[in-house]
């Protein structure tokens, strides 16, 4: 009996030693992978992550990209998509009566509505009528929109005129001249939603860069405790010596 126990103990020690040499049996070595895609929110989206294999990385990023595409279509105010009651659909129809909206759009609009008292006018997604004039002027190569048209549009930017029925999943514009524009929030909100999903995935160590919106997951698995994010001024500015950057932020699980 003692001889058998000794042999079993020796076998267990050999297994533990082998696991130590190989870096652990339960967890494969994590490698750094990255990819970029260009088809959402009119910008380049890059995801860097640490995964146990290329297959794991591709699987997680594939799902993350599908989520980006979905949010892009739902929050798009310029294009229609078959079967999608997105922002464009709402802007085109909500002045005539309550219209259905995708669940993701309802959630975002309700969140923005509830934040209005604390925002104090700093962010107003109901400025679509004003922003449309600037968009049209830019597309036409005009330096400035018509001032009278801007003043008229500025009278139709009251978020309280956006009536949400969360139970029915509908949106109604009490002001028929009002229009929504999600450009101030859509990319950052989407990056956060995707990041929350990725934190529970097989690859919780990641960083997402989506057109100036950067979201870090758990710390990088290369010995560092934080991700380094360089800040660059698009115009001429004095930066850190020898880098061209204004500053570097070191973050973990933050935007």
Regions found by a protein language model. Give the residues of each.
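Mature catalytic core of soluble alpha/beta enzymes
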Residues: 2-255
């Amino acid at each position: 009996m003692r001889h058998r126990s000794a042999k079993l103990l020796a076998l267990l020690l050999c297994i533990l030693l082998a696991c130590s040499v190989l870096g652990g049996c339960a967890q494969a070595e994590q490698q750094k992978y990255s990819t970029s895609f260009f088809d959402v929110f009119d910008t380049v989206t890059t995801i860097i992550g640490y995964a146990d294999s290329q297959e794991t990385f591709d699987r997680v990023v594939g799902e993350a990209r599908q989520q980006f595409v979905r949010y892009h279509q739902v929050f798009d105010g310029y294009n229609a998509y078959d079967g999608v009651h997105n922002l464009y659909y709402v802007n085109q129809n909500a002045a005539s009566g309550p219209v259905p909206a995708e669940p993701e759009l309802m959630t975002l609009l309700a969140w923005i509505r509830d934040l209005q008292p604390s925002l104090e006018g700093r962010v107003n997604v109901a400025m679509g009528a004003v922003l449309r004039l600037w968009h049209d002027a830019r597309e036409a190569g005009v330096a400035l929109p018509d001032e009278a048209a801007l003043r008229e549009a500025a009278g139709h930017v009251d978020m309280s005129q956006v009536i949400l029925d969360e139970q029915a999943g509908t949106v109604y514009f009490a002001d028929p001249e009002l229009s929504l524009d999600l450009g101030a929030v859509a990319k950052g909100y989407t990056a956060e939603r995707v990041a929350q999903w990725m934190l529970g995935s097989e690859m919780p160590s990641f960083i997402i860069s989506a057109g100036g919106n950067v979201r870090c997951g758990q710390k990088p698995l290369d010995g560092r405790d934080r991700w380094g994010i360089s800040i660059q001024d698009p115009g001429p500015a004095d930066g850190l010596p020898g880098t061209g950057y204004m500053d570097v932020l070191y973050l973990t699980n933050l935007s």
